[in-house]
Amino acid sequence: MSDYEEAFNDGNENFEDFDVEHFSDEETYEEKPQFKDGETTDANGKTIVTGGNGPEDFQQHEQIRRKTLKEKAIPKDQRATTPYMTKYERARILGTRALQISMNAPVFVDLEGETDPLRIAMKELAEKKIPLVIRRYLPDGSFEDWSVEELIVDL
């Protein structure tokens, strides 16, 4: 008998029995009271008046109109974020552009014998010829769009 066979002995296994299904009794569930005009009656006949966030309040929240994408966009003259490209944006831009170049996207700089897509993307970034837009989200849900040409890049 080898060590391999001993691992599969007839001892108790440490797992649950997955064949047994558990169903809860339907009797344990109670019906929720129906609120009409913020009031209902309980089993004893007492009137319960709802306050706070009742069904009516949630209906009012559903009626609030959400802002569209155009309304969330901040115009160029009202931008609040820094015009400098962060290292995270730089990494994302270079990686995205290198992937595009590796998939035979047109290159906007002279190659000069360069074959590495990341080096070509770095050269495009240095000359600010990458045709991508960075979207910066703000805490209130609005966003600013910056083109790569507009951002100041520290190389």
Curated annotation (Swiss-Prot):
InterPro entries linked to this entry: DNA-dir_RNA_polK_14-18kDa_CS (IPR020708), Pol_omega/Rpo6/RPB6 (IPR006110), RPB6 (IPR028363), RPB6/omega-like_sf (IPR036161), Rpo6/Rpb6 (IPR006111)
Single GO BP term: RNA-templated transcription
Basic and acidic residues composition bias: residue spans: 20-39
Top-level taxon of origin: Eukaryota
SMART domains (UniProt xref): RNA_pol_Rpb6
The entry's keywords: Cytoplasm, DNA-directed RNA polymerase, Nucleus, Phosphoprotein, Ribosome biogenesis, Transcription
Pfam families per UniProt: RNA_pol_Rpb6
Annotated protein name in UniProt: DNA-directed RNA polymerases I, II, and III subunit RPABC2
Organism for this UniProt entry: Saccharomyces cerevisiae (strain ATCC 204508 / S288c)
The organism's taxonomic lineage, starting at the top: Eukaryota, Fungi, Dikarya, Ascomycota, Saccharomycotina
